[in-house]
Amino acid sequence: EHGYLLNKYTGCKVWCVINNEECGYLCNKRRGGYYGYCYFWKLACYCQGARKSELWNYKTNKCDL
């Protein structure tokens, strides 16, 4: 699956500014994906190849920030 990483504590996307290194680490090492980067226009970490449960979903959005 591909999409924005989910912050499991807040229910929001994992936010970033320009830090591809952190997003890559979270995606590759912590979430089972193969490529992660900071999507600048959305200010959120995008991950390719992660499990569906690791990704933020608009329909099940629980972000209250």
UniProtKB/Swiss-Prot annotation:
Database matches in InterPro entries: LCN-type_CS_alpha_beta_dom, Scorpion_toxin-like, Scorpion_toxin-like_sf, Scorpion_toxinL/defensin
Principal subcellular localisation of the protein: secreted
Tissue expression remark: Expressed by the venom gland.
GO molecular function, one term: toxin activity
Coiled coil: none
Domain LCN-type CS-alpha/beta, chain residue ranges per copy: 1-64
Family to which the UniProt record says this protein belongs: Belongs to the long (4 C-C) scorpion toxin superfamily. Sodium channel inhibitor family.
Record's comment describing the protein's domains: Has the structural arrangement of an alpha-helix connected to antiparallel beta-sheets by disulfide bonds (CS-alpha/beta).
Protein name: Toxin AaHIT4
Organism field: Androctonus australis
